[in-house]
Amino acid sequence: MKKIILAIMTLVLVFGSFVTVRADAPVDVATDGDAEAVVEATALEGGNEALQIQSKSVLLMELESGTVLYEKNADEMLRPASVTKVMTLLLIFEALERGDIALDDTVVVTEHAASMGGSQCFFEAGEEQTVQDMIKCIEVASGNDAAVAMAEHLAGSEAAFVQKMNERAKELGMEHTHFDNACGLEVETHLTSARDIAIMSRQLLLYHPDILTYSTIWMDSITHKTRRGESRFDLANTNKFLNLYTGANGLKTGYTSQAKYCMSATATRDGVTLIAVVMGAETKEVRNSEAMKLLDYGFAQCRTYVDTEVVPEDLQIPVKKGTCKSVPVKPVEQHTITLVAANPDQIEKQVIAYENLKAPIPEGDAVGVVQYSCNGTYIGEVMLYAEYPVPELNFRYSLSDIAGRIFMAK
């Protein structure tokens, strides 16, 4: 539906001058340098001095807006190791949301899944576990066998699931990614980039925040149920970063001899969530320290803006062919926006009503939007909804209205 800016003097007095809002692209900074040596990667224009980064590739992203705050070789295709499982988990949570599976569904481990090497939970063929426990095994213990078991449960085979992984990557705009398996075991053509890892991590966090329930588990356990009986198996979180950085809450680590140390690290402070992707670090100490360095830089750049008066109490949106000429909007208590390298004093907002809004309008129907901009760049919006229904003006109502006016005039 087209939109038109409301030219109402009272709104101008409340909100100030209206400005044109543009949906500009997020800050996207390219970098140069030798990936094998310590180089100065480029940060936000006008930001702090460039960071000293040893890892082959890094990227720092603000969750809410998707703004890239810092990057180095962010589009270089590298081996992601177990960070691959971010996509596996994304597809699992999307299947849960659609109702294709439920957390208490039973997953049967196949011979193929049980044969996975690397990090594993040592399932036996024929063993049964719930979807919820499989998610724990993937997110907490980074179990390759659990990831493949879930892939087969969802798609019938790992190959079919991998096809879905690649299709979803394409849909998300992950232009430097090709998956060959569901767990991240070494395959020459199994590659992705720091930018693409940030994209899928953001998708998982934004739309399936329940992942944090699992990613923040430090210790847990499952029960193996095999032909030999039952036995407890302890799960220890592979992401030790959780205890190293204040506010850390995820998301996935990875290591193979060729991929080196990788991580999609997430942390939240004062309402701001950041994603720091590190790929190709020579040691886990370098991986962790550079994730910390990126997050420290990001939190120094970000702040939270709270608008406590989104719209005036008497705001009315024009309506055509209705029993009244306008409709009030439902009150909006407040709206919070994460600002990246910006001053709250530079924020402007404008009320935009839907063009040619015609009755009938149900209660709660969208009738407009408040858009926020900073230095001319779109940074967010709040939808406006009708506070009560507006019936269509019909012949019977018109006669009644005319009769009422005549009576009142006497």
Please give the residue ranges for each predicted region:
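Sec-dependent N-terminal signal peptides of Gram-positive bacterial secreted proteins and lipoproteins
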Residues: 2-22
